[in-house]
C-alpha cells in the first residue's frame, strides 16, 4: 500500500496528497538565513520544521531520492550596514554568522541539507535570468536599476490570495519616479559610492548587486531546475519574497510552474509579543546555548505546536519541554531498548500535515505505558517505541545517564559520593548529611540502594 502524505499547500489553501513530479528525484528548496546577525529563535523554528519535513520525505522515498537545497543569503543591504557598524569586512561578518548558523542547526539536531549554496557564488545565474526577463518585456532598466514589471506577471496575487492594493497596504515600497509602477521591485541595483568592493559585481548594467528575490529564483533553478516539488519558508515570506519569486521565475521560464507545493511555518512570539530588539525580547539561539538549555529541549518546544500555528516562547514552555523529555528518558532508563518499525499511529500523525502535537502525545502515551506495564516484555516494547519515535523526529539521541547528567562534573560528584560512603562506614552521619545537602544545593539527587551502593542523578 502506497504511503499518502497530506501536506498543506499555501498555493491552493488546502491539504493535498504529496505527489512529487518524480518519485526518484524529489526536490525541495527552503529559504535559509541572511547572515548579518546571529539567528534568533524564530529562524530556528523554520530550521527545525523543514528538517522534520526532510526526514518524512526521506522516509517515504529514500534518502538517495531526495535533494534538499537551503540557501545562504550573503549579499544584502543589512549585511553592508552591520559590517560598517561593527567595523569588520563583509567576508568576516558573513563567515562568522554562517558558522554560528551551522552551530545552531547542529545544536537543534538538524540534518545537513543536500546543498547549501551561497548567493555570492551564483551572480552569473542571476544575471542570466534578469537578461531573460528584460528580453521578454517583464523587466526594464531605469536610473541604473533593473526593475521587474509586476503588472506584466500573470496571477501575481495567487500565492497571497489578496488583491494588489491589499497586498501593498502597510508595506514599505521604495518609490522612484523612474518606475513604471510603484509595486515594481528591483532585480539589480547599482553600487553606491564608498561601498565595499566585494559586495558589488560586474554586470551588463554596471557595477552593482542583485535584489533579494532574484537570488532564490537563481539558486533553485541552478540546483533543482525550472520545476520542483516543495518550497518552504516562514509565513512572513509569502509576500513579498515568495510572491516575487514565483512571478519572476514563471516569467523567465514560461513553461514552468516553479514550485508545486508551498509550505509556510507560523510566527514565533516571545511572552505574547512580537520579537524585536526595541522591546528587549530579541532572543538568539546562542542565548539559549549560553544558558545551557539542551538543544533537544528547544527542538521539542519548537515541535510542540503545529508548524502552521503561532508559537509563543516563554520560560514555562521551555520548562514543560524539559519535563516531557525527562519523563521520556526516565521511562527508558534501565530497559534494554531496541529500534523497531515506526508505530503506525505515530507515522500517520506525521503524514497528516506534520501533526507534531499528536505525535508528541503518542510518545507520551508510550511512556505512560512503560510505568503501568505489568510485564517486562510490555515495558520493553513501550520503551522501544519511545526511542524509535523520538529518534525519528530528532530527539532522544543521548542515553538516560548522559541526559540527566549533562553539564555535571562527574569526577567531582563521584568523589563526593565516595567520600560520603566512607563517612557512612565510619558512622560519621553528620558529614554524610552535609555532603548530601551540598550536592542537593547543586541539584544532584542521591539515592541509597539496599545493597549499600549510591546512585546519583541531576534534578
Swiss-Prot record:
Cited SUPFAM superfamilies: Anticodon-binding domain of a subclass of class I aminoacyl-tRNA synthetases, Nucleotidylyl transferase
Catalysed transformations (reactions): tRNA(Cys) + L-cysteine + ATP = L-cysteinyl-tRNA(Cys) + AMP + diphosphate
One GO cellular component term noted in the UniProt record for this chain: cytosol
GO biological process, one term: cysteinyl-tRNA aminoacylation
GO molecular function: ATP binding; cysteine-tRNA ligase activity; zinc ion binding
CDD domains found in the cross-reference section: CysRS_core
Highest rank taxon of the organism: Bacteria
The record's free-text note on cofactor binding: Binds 1 zinc ion per subunit.
Chain span(s) of sequence motif 'HIGH' region: 33-43
Residues noted as binding ATP in the record, renumbered to the chain: 277
Principal EC category: ligase
Keyword Protein biosynthesis in annotation: yes
Similarity section: Belongs to the class-I aminoacyl-tRNA synthetase family.
Entries under HAMAP family matching the protein: Cys_tRNA_synth
Protein name: Cysteine--tRNA ligase
Organism: Rickettsia conorii (strain ATCC VR-613 / Malish 7)
